[in-house]
UniProtKB/Swiss-Prot annotation:
It is an enzyme of class 2 (transferase). Keywords: Cobalamin biosynthesis, Glycosyltransferase, Transferase. InterPro entries: Nict_dMeBzImd_PRibTrfase, Nict_dMeBzImd_PRibTrfase_bact, Nict_dMeBzImd_PRibTrfase_N, Nict_dMeBzImd_PRibTrfase_sf. It catalyses: 5,6-dimethylbenzimidazole + nicotinate beta-D-ribonucleotide = alpha-ribazole 5'-phosphate + nicotinate + H(+). Pfam families: DBI_PRT. GO terms for molecular function: nicotinate-nucleotide-dimethylbenzimidazole phosphoribosyltransferase activity. It comes from Brucella anthropi (strain ATCC 49188 / DSM 6882 / CCUG 24695 / JCM 21032 / LMG 3331 / NBRC 15819 / NCTC 12168 / Alc 37) (Ochrobactrum anthropi). Pathway: Nucleoside biosynthesis; alpha-ribazole biosynthesis; alpha-ribazole from 5,6-dimethylbenzimidazole: step 1/2. This is Nicotinate-nucleotide--dimethylbenzimidazole phosphoribosyltransferase.
């Protein structure tokens, strides 16, 4: 905690003073790309990805040796409003499934040689029901962000962030509405299958929550504490920690992007080291990416969470780095360049 004793002060200071990109490393990558055995620009966005890796790792030949998927799990008091077809107990059951290797994210990590860590965030203690009270007080929220910063402990050179939490698309929609305005209908989607009356209750919950806390939503970190979830606060912390340690980040779907959006609202440059792995089928996600000016890497109609979209995108990032470092130059291969 800062000397002032206010829980968020250290994070506000951090967000104001983030390290920038290494433009020299980015330039070196662009220069090497021009010499590789391919027409200029023919690898399309893969070339931009390598330049992004160089800028945020500071390495002129970026390599991905220890990629990690970090999945944060949290429960939400707002589920008491009967907004989702699944009970909150499913969150803990899915954490057990991750540990047993039985989830989709386990298979994608195996297929792409990615590490996996799962962080259980006090599942037995849901956050406050945001339609009646703040999700967290500032001290709890700040402590959870600090916990999320530990995701990079042990070392990684590419961090993919994802989540698990019954009810958390409601939370993401409330955050998006508070940060970017519009109507609840702009941001609320079916999530894990909320239709009919469930969807109407979900819409009502988002409206009620934002109206209840409206006087306290001018500061993005207060938006996080009042409307957020533990997994969302932890993901925000992980994104910040990665920035400080020169670790590029791949963000997963709607809920993970809501964590990034809090940082973006505080400082638009705070997520420049983030690549958005995919656009979810959850309708609010595309709008949220547009608000932040971010282009997703994949569009596959996915809406599972768990970091699955980020993990699939990591395979492309790994391939981009290998193409850059492993391809021969025209001179090395004895191939004539363009006239």
């Amino acid at each position: 905690m800062s000397a002032s004793g206010l829980p968020f002060d250290d994070f506000r200071e951090l967000i104001r003073n983030l390290p920038g990109p290494d433009l020299g490393a980015e330039r070196a990558v662009r220069e090497r790309e021009a010499t590789l055995t391919k027409p200029a620009g023919s690898l399309g966005r893969m070339e931009d990805i390598v330049a992004w890796l160089a800028a945020w790792t500071g390495k002129r030949t970026p390599q991905i040796n220890r990629p990690l998927v970090a999945v944060f799990a949290g429960n939400h008091g707002v589920t008491a409003k009967n907004i989702t077809p699944f009970p909150p107990s499913v969150t803990a059951q899915m954490v057990e499934n991750f540990a047993a290797g039985g989830a989709a994210i386990n298979q994608i990590c195996i297929a792409n040689d990615l590490g996996l860590k799962v962080f259980d965030l006090a599942l037995e203690h849901p956050t406050g029901d945001i339609t009646e009270e703040p999700a967290m007080d500032e001290r709890t929220c700040a402590a959870t962000m600090a916990f999320g910063m530990e995701a990079i402990a042990g070392g990684t050179d590419l961090l993919c962030i994802g989540e698990m939490g019954i009810g958390n698309t409601t939370i993401a929609a409330a955050i998006a509405l508070a940060l970017f305005g519009g109507t609840a209908e702009d941001w609320v989607g079916p999530g894990t299958g909320s239709t009919g009356e469930l969807l109407q209750r979900k819409l009502a919950a988002v409206r009620q929550a934002v109206a209840l806390h409206q006087a306290h939503l001018q500061d993005p970190l207060e938006v996080l504490s009042r409307l957020g979830g533990r997994e969302i606060a932890a993901m925000a912390g992980a994104i910040l920690a990665a920035r400080m340690e020169k670790i590029p980040v791949i963000v997963d779907g709607f809920v993970a992007s809501a964590a990034a959006a809090v940082l973006y609202a505080a400082n638009p440059e705070a997520i420049d080291h983030c690549l958005f792995g995919h656009v979810s089928a959850e309708p609010g996600h595309r709008k949220l990416l547009e608000k932040m000016g971010k282009q997703p890497l994949l569009d596959m109609g996915m809406r599972l969470g768990e970091g699955t979209g980020a993990a699939l995108a990591a395979s492309i990032v790994k391939a981009a780095a290998l193409c850059h470092s492993g391809m021969a130059t025209f001179e090395q291969a004895g191939i004539s360049g363009s006239k």
